[in-house]
Amino acid sequence: MSGNSLGPNADVLEAQARVCTGPHQTRPLGVKDTDPVQPETVLEIILKSAKRELSIDQMVSDAQMGAFFAAMTIRKHFPPDTRWSQSEIAAFDKYAPDLTEFMPPEIEFLRYPDTAYCSSTPEENIVVGALKRILKREHLTYGETLKVCKAILTNRVKDALKAATLIGQRMNLESYDEVLG
C-alpha cells in the first residue's frame, strides 16, 4: 500500500526537524517572524502538494505528511513551552477548510484521532488502533509495539500511517537523558 514516492520537501523537512521531537526538545513554528519556517508556509506547501500544484521534486510525500500531522496532534498535549504557538494555531485555523477538503482520510484521522477511520486491511486496523493511543501520548507496551511493527513491515499499511506511528511512538518516548545530550 505504498503511497507516492515523492519528497521529502525541504521546507516541510525543516519544519519536521523542529516539531517531530519530544515534549522537551520541540521548537514550535512561527514563534518569531524571523523563524526559518512559518506554519502558514508549511500548510501552503502541503496543500499545493495535495492539489498536485508543485513540481515532482517539491512535492510532499505521504509519509512526510503523516509524520508532520501526527507530530502536530501529539503536540496539543505537550507542556506549554512546546505546545502549539499562536502562529501555528492561526495557520491551522486559516487552512482548516482546505485541509478538510484536500487531505486524504488517513491524514484527517491523524488530525482528529477521535473521528471514525475505515481501515482497508487488517494490518492497517492494527496500526490505527495503536495510533489512537499514540496520538493521545499513551505508551504502547512491548508486545503492542512488536505487533504494530510487524504490521508496518507489510506492504498493507498506508505510508502516512506508518510514518505517523514511528514518529509518534518515538516522540512519546523521549527520555530525560536525551534532552541532556
Predicted ranges, named:
Residues M1-G181:
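Acidic, glycine/proline-rich low-complexity segments that act as flexible tails and inter-domain linkers
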